[in-house]
Each structure stands twice: as structure tokens, then as C-alpha cells.
Amino acid sequence: MKFKLKRIDWYIIKQFLGTYIFAIALIIAISVVFDINEKIDKFLSPDVPLKAIVFDYYMNFIQYFANLFSPLFTFIAVIFFTSKLADNSEVIAMLASGMSFRRLMLPYAISAGIIALSTFVLNAYIIPPANATRIDFQNKYIKNKKVDYVRSAQLEIEPGVIAYFDRYDARSGMGYRFSLEHFENKKMISRLTANSIKYDSLYNWTLIDYMIRDFDGMREHITEGSRMDTTLTIVPSDFLISVNDCETMTSSELSTYIDRQKKRGIGNIQTFQIEYHKRFAAIMAAFILTSIGASLSSRKIKGGMGLNIGIGLALSFSYILFTTVTSTFAINGNLSPAMAAWIPNILYTFIAIYLYRKAPR
């Protein structure tokens, strides 16, 4: 059976998306004003070009925060315009004309689908390169959060080949107390050590004051030297990991990076895994929060629109808070990144089902 969209459907879709865009514009405008006020001292520096502030920072700042709080804007939009419809008795008129609440939800679902698809495309492909530009600006002119120093970095660069840096400084491109161990059938067959190692270019390194020990049964062959150029399938970015790095990768890059780091035995990748799963969880969040908002605000109540908006804001902020809490547990506890991303959606799905059943018929 085909559903033909009626004038009322287009009216609801227009109201939904219009209110959503208005909410984004309003909140982002306020956020930009507060951000300028906070960073005005940095921006007034003669070293910071106005063009970079506008195009490298704020153009990308707006995209990032608009998409980050998309669930909140979706919820506010639904609550606001549905409460207005209910307050004007328009919802009652629709239901009295024979339209079921389920049918009434169709334009809401279409609008949520448009927002969900837009959010996914932005998250997966458009915002990551924009974030790279924004974060580069922040690191250069505001506060450098880029990781350029690491201690005790160990990773498996190939099956049975373990590399270890006691410390590495990206500013000089130098690593210290480096070792490279080769294993076959769980037995060490060679061990290379160097007082220092310098990164040259992609996979090209220079060993300084090195020693190679090759094991052949009970025999040991030692080779020493002051300098040697070699090729290692690692680059500094493999172990110089910043929390912000996950925001600069497209979803395909994120998936490839996670798989590569897992194979190399690097453990601190929970933030990257959470970011990857969140991008898919955000698709469902648009539908869940739309259902909650429509079900909650479609009934005309004594408190009017203000009460509905208050309840809606409380629920939306609790959703964001719950998402933050589960992410923290995944990073610092035993909760899996996939569960951390999806638990808020699962919980709020039950809330959506309950409110849907209680909605006016």
C-alpha cells in the first residue's frame, strides 16, 4: 500500500525541519558569541589572521557543534512545534478527523530520517576534514593539545616483530632506547637495540649506536655500528595518539585505523572505537528522540507549552549526560565501546515505547 503525503504531512515536515534549523541557528549564534568572548585575547594577537579565524576556525566550529548537538536540536524542535500544535488543538482536530496517532507519526519519521541521513553523512565524510582544519588552528594559535611526546611505546609492527621506544619526541623526530625483537614460534631469533633512532620519512628511520644480536640455537652473533639507515613499517602517528585525532578521521579511515592498531597490540584506542560506533548510533537517536518528543508533547496539558519544553529539555540533557557517562566507563572501565555508544539508545527506546503507548489516540 502506498502512502501519499497530504498537505498536513508537508505542513508538519516543514514545521519540524524549520524549527530544527532555527534552533540550531539560535544556539550556535549564542555559542559563537560566548566562544569569541572567551578567546578574544588570542584573536587580537597580530599573529592570528582574521581570515583564519573566520574560515579555518568558525566555519568549521559551527559545523562541528551543530552536528554534535543534533539530538538536542531535534528534540527541542519536536517538543516546541508539537506543543504549539497541541496548544492550538490542532492535534485533537487531526485525531478527531479519523487520523490515527500512528499515521500522524509518518511526517515525523520522514523528518527524522532526513536529519539522521544528514547527520551520518556529515559525521562520516564532511566534518572530519573540517575538524582537522579547526584543530590545527587551535593547536597553532590558541592552545596546543597535539601529542608530541610519548614514553614506553610498544607495538607489534608485523606478526612476530615487536618495536619499543622508551621515549619519543616528535619535535626533534628522535626516539631513545629503541629495541626491535623478532620472534618465530614464540622464540626470539634476533634483537636490535639502539641508543637513539631518528625518523626520516615514510617508514625510513636512522639507527644511532646500534647493536644486533642474532640467535641460532646456543650461538649468538653480534653486529654493532654507529649509524644505519633502515626501513620500519611504523610512523610516529602510530603511537603519538591524541584524543582529538578520532574527530579528524572519516568513518572508513577510523575503521582502518582501529583494525591496524588492534593488530599492532596498541590498547588505548577506546576513544576511537566509541567515536566510530557513535556515528552509527546517532542515526537511531534521531528517530528515538523524535518519537519521545512527539508522544510527550502531543497531549494538551494545563502547564501548556512551557511544561512540555521543560520536560523535553530535561530528557534531552539527560540523554547527552548518559552518553558521556557510558563513554567514560568504556574508556576507564570494562564497558565495551559498542555498548557505550548504544546503551543510551536502548534505554531511551523503552522510554519512547512507553510514551508512544500513552500518547492520545
Language model feature labels by segment:
Residues 1-159, 170, 218, 236-361:
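Transmembrane alpha-helices
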Residues 199-221, 241-249:
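A short, charged
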Residues 187-190, 216-226:
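A short, polar/proline- and glycine-enriched secondary-structure boundary/capping micro-motif
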Residues 157-210:
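Structural signature for solvent-exposed beta-strand/loop edge elements and short helix-capping sites
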Residues 3, 220-234:
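Generic detection of short hydrophobic beta-strand segments and adjacent strand-loop junctions
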Residues 195-198, 209-213, 228-229, 237-242, ...:
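Short C-terminal domain-edge/linker segments immediately following a structured domain
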